[in-house]
């Protein structure tokens, strides 16, 4: 996933960075989508270099910019999330977390308070997203499987 096909006749674009999100395997579909969306907003907000140029269609209608590179979506058990979280912090990668408590809140202030109330090793993680050098992200996510 470190390569993107270029338009006809162009060379593939290769990335030395990677964006990956790890979701807990026991989440309901709506929870997976919600967690992924929130985590990706964190990666985008904390890493403006991940954002590409604005889009436009053939009629000139403008659309918002999106990530400049693919996002790898993985899944794993509770232990895998804890392991990946620790690895990401040890490697000082840009990291976003989503805990089970956030399903009970309805705004950013309460979300931040819910995370702040629990120590790092006791967080009930349901999602972790990371951005960094490709090889470092691969090491962080080692053992996780591709999301179906």
Q: What function would you assign to each model-found segment?
A:
Residues 1-148:
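Positively charged, small/polar-rich N-terminal and surface patches that mediate targeting and assembly
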């Amino acid at each position: 996933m470190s390569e993107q096909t270029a338009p006809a006749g162009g060379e593939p674009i290769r990335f030395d960075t990677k964006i990956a999100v790890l979701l807990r395997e026991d989440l309901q579909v709506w929870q997976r989508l919600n967690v992924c969306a929130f985590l990706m907003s964190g990666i985008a907000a904390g890493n403006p270099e991940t954002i590409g140029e604005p889009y436009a269609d053939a009629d000139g209608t403008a659309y918002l910019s999106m990530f400049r590179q693919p996002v790898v979506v993985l899944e794993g058990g509770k232990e895998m999330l804890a392991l990946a979280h620790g690895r990401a912090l040890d490697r000082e990668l840009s990291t976003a977390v989503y805990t089970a408590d956030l399903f009970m809140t309805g705004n950013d202030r309460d979300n931040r308070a819910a995370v702040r109330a629990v120590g790092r090793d006791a967080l009930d993680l349901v999602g972790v997203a990371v951005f960094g050098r490709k090889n470092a992200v691969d090491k962080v996510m080692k053992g996780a499987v591709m999301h179906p």
